[in-house]
Amino acid sequence: MSGTSLNSQRLDTSRITCTAIIKCLRPVYRRAGIAFTRGENTVEVTEEQLAIIRADSVLSVVSASSAETLAEAGGLDVLGVGDLNTRIRATVAGLDKANPEHFTAGGEPKVKAVSAALGEPVSSAQIKAALAEADA
């Protein structure tokens, strides 16, 4: 009977969910019972699903937060804007300011250079917003 109780406890722990942002490299991809599309996908997953996703070379975990953490924090930025802004700022900081392919004559980062270094397309408005957020 105690073995059954232990198995039940294991099943209960596998049902603990977290919210994860998963980046998919393919147009459509299915793993761990979840359908993903190219780009970032915000999904609710169990710890078992998260382990399967972490082991997959087509998917990468951008972030993962337990349900308790989200409740304490007051929610999740479902659009991932804060995370994207942080990544844009880090990318711009890593560009060569002396390289005319990276920056305009006025000192603005070029969209093409930021998108290439970031590994995903971003707009001029997104870059400006990310940099303005850092100045605020």
Swiss-Prot record:
Q: Does the keyword Signal apply?
A: no
Induction / repression: Expressed in the late phase of the viral replicative cycle. Expression of late genes is activated by the viral late transcription activator C.
Its cellular-component GO annotations read: host cell cytoplasm
InterPro entries reported for this sequence: FluMu_N
Subcellular location(s): the record lists: Host cytoplasm
Q: Which UniProt keywords apply?
A: Host cytoplasm, Late protein
Q: Identify the stretch annotated as signal peptide in this record.
A: none
| Record has Protein biosynthesis as a keyword | no
Write down the superkingdom of origin.
Answer: Viruses
Q: What is this protein called?
A: Uncharacterized protein gp35
